[in-house]
């Protein structure tokens, strides 16, 4: 009766700039009689509704007519829309059914479509687009013998592992577990592997926190202005950034600004610092940063972990401490040479705080990168009852792309091409182009099971917890997971955005959730076949870099096979046990695990194949 899909029938496609004119086209069957047909658009921030009639445009094929409606530019914001069809005495509604339009009797039956309108001046760093990123958990990458770790202020609670291959402590293996055991990875260890990163065509390294902290994850900040003494010194870090940038590799730091550590200059619960911390006195210069329920032992903390007292982000003194353009934490580390930030738990920050982080970071370096830890669609996220405006142009450049991580893994495991296509298109439609080109595409992180573990099991959570510390995959399990990872990484490297390799995934490391996804990098136990796959994949992406910036279009979705176009490159993933024919597209193979057969009319793709071709 009525055909509409915003991917095909909203122009321009995707999120709009606030200076874009735009229009919708709807195709209505000629024998579908109605009195009136309107689009209803709601401004999510103001509550204002806009109603406008669609007008007949022209007769089209197959007994359909085209109706359309045009709009002048909208203000920056988030909008939702649907269509209303008016008959003599009742209405029906055209609503969003997996992006396609579906007629329903009730407005509540299906969701509206989303329309994102962002600031026309919103830009993201060009140096980042088309590149490849690598994530390192600093304590677990490499321990250089050239650095001798200094004694820490809280040395008495820390545990140093002598054996690099030690299994990390956990609540399964140790009572009163507090993540205080260290493998002693350090800055010089990372720098010693620079040629390794160059071989993988890495252009940015995201480091989990490096500042002083008594815990190996270092999310419990003790001192915002100093590298942890186990990891290195500020002087070494400045040289580290400079040396890597000379080889076109930029450093991204983890910004942990939602909470501090209880064992810190600022809170000082255990008196390991010379400061008067908030825990020590209500006259402390830091007291107003924290929210005490019953001083000193009851206070708000992140998810109830008393080692992570939350800060009051609205507090001006704290906000200045982080964001002052001359003396703030953000500025301090950028002066030492970092190229940007990954903001931990971005949902915990009020909008005003995020605004200031962007202002501060871009003030020092207009090309600074700001990535947020957001686990959902960042354009419509609600946190603490507030609709967030991460991607309207004045906060984040990018987010960790967990929705596509899940979509990729589900696709290669379950082979449902339609579900995969839908999940990809949702973000293509909602994300501003500058953000889409910069989104951080991951398959795993320090907060998830490693990707090989995800691919080896239907559900890793089904594995008994007591088996996880020393779990070894069977050869059959590993071979299956590795083969699926090759498909998954090909997709990761060819979708819009920037692929990020979590350290060790490329050499066959696997593991369950924290801390077993954070083992020491196995320098002497690498899967060379898998590593070569990643090297060749990164070479392919790097050699065709311009094709992987902007422009994305699905060409084919059928059963267990998808094909999408990135400018002059066609990427095909066929998980089916039979061949598929991609009509109208042929060319030379650039990368893949199988040969294709090109004809004047299209390309025959063999079963169980991932391949990229240069379109003729």
Placement of each model-derived feature along the sequence:
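Hydrophobic faces of well-ordered beta-strands that scaffold small-molecule active sites
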Residues: 132-134, 205-207, 251-253, 341, ...
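C-terminal accessory region downstream of the catalytic core in glycan-modifying enzymes
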Residues: 520-531, 537-544, 580-600, 605-609
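Active-site-proximal helices and loops of the catalytic beta/alpha 8
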Residues: 241, 245-250, 258-259, 264-275, ...
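Aromatic/acidic polysaccharide-binding cleft in carbohydrate-active enzymes
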Residues: 139, 384-385, 437-473, 489-526
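C-terminal beta-strand-rich structural cap/linker in extracellular carbohydrate-active enzymes
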Residues: 30, 568-569, 599-616
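Glycan-association/targeting regions that enable binding to alpha-glucans and other polysaccharides
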Residues: 1-130
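Substrate-binding/active-site clefts of carbohydrate-active enzymes
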Residues: 137-203, 210-335, 357-363
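Carbohydrate-binding surface patches
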Residues: 554-585
């Amino acid at each position: 009766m009525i055909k509409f899909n915003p991917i095909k029938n909203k122009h321009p496609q995707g999120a709009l700039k606030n200076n874009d004119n735009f229009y919708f086209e709807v195709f209505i069957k000629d024998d579908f009689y109605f009195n009136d047909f309107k689009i209803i658009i709601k401004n999510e921030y103001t509550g204002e509704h806009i109603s406008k009639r669609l007008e007949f445009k022209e007769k089209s094929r197959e007994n359909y007519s085209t109706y359309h409606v045009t709009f002048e530019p909208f203000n920056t914001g988030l909008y939702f829309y649907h269509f209303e069809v008016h008959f003599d005495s009742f209405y029906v509604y055209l609503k969003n059914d997996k992006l396609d339009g579906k007629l329903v009797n009730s407005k509540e039956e299906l969701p509206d479509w989303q329309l994102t309108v962002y600031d026309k001046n919103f830009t993201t760093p060009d140096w980042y687009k088309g590149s490849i990123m690598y994530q390192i958990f600093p304590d677990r990458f490499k321990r250089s013998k050239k650095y001798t770790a200094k004694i820490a202020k809280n040395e008495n609670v820390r545990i140093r592992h002598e054996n690099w291959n030690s299994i990390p402590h956990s609540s399964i293996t140790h009572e009163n577990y507090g993540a205080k055991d260290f493998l002693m990875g350090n800055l010089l260890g990372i720098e010693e592997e620079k040629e390794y990163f160059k071989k993988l065509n890495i252009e940015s390294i995201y480091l989990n926190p490096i500042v002083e902290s008594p815990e190996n994850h270092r999310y419990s900040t003790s001192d915002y202005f100093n590298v942890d003494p186990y990891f290195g010194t500020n002087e070494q870090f400045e040289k580290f950034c400079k040396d890597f940038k000379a080889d076109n590799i930029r450093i991204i730091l983890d910004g942990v600004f939602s909470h501090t550590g209880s064992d810190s200059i600022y809170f000082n619960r255990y008196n390991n610092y010379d400061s008067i911390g908030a825990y020590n006195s209500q006259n402390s210069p830091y007291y107003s940063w924290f929210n005490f329920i019953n001083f000193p032992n009851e206070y708000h903390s992140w998810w109830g972990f008393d080692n992570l007292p939350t800060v009051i982000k609205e507090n001006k003194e704290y906000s200045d401490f982080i964001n002052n353009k001359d003396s703030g934490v953000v500025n301090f580390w950028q002066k030492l040479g970092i190229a940007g930030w990954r903001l931990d738990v971005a949902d915990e920050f009020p909008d005003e705080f995020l605004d200031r982080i962007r202002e501060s970071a871009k003030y020092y370096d207009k090309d600074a990168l700001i990535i947020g830890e957001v686990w959902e669609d960042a354009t419509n996220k609600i946190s603490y009852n507030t609709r967030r405006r991460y991607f309207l142009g004045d906060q984040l450049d990018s987010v960790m792309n967990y929705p596509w991580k899940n979509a990729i893994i589900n696709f290669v495991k379950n082979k449902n091409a339609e579900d995969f296509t839908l999940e990809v298109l949702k973000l293509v439609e909602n994300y501003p182009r500058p953000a889409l080109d910069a989104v951080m595409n991951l398959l795993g992180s320090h907060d998830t099971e490693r990707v090989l573990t995800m691919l080896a099991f239907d559900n890793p959570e089904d594995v008994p917890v007591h088996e996880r510390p020393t779990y070894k995959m069977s050869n059959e399990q590993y071979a299956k997971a590795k083969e699926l990872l090759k498909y998954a990484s090909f997709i990761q490297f060819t979708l819009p955005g920037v692929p990020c390799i979590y350290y060790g995934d490329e050499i066959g490391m696997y593991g369950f959730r924290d801390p077993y996804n954070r083992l020491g990098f196995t320098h002497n136990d690498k899967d060379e076949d898998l590593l070569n796959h990643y090297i060749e994949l990164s070479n392919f992406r790097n050699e065709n870099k311009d094709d992987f910036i902007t422009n994305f279009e699905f060409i084919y979705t059928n059963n267990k096979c998808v094909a999408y176009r990135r400018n002059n490159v066609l990427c095909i993933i066929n998980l089916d046990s039979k061949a598929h024919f991609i009509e109208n597209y042929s060319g030379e193979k650039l990368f893949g695990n199988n040969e294709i057969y090109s004809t004047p009319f299209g390309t025959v793709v063999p079963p169980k194949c991932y391949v990229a071709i240069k379109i003729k």
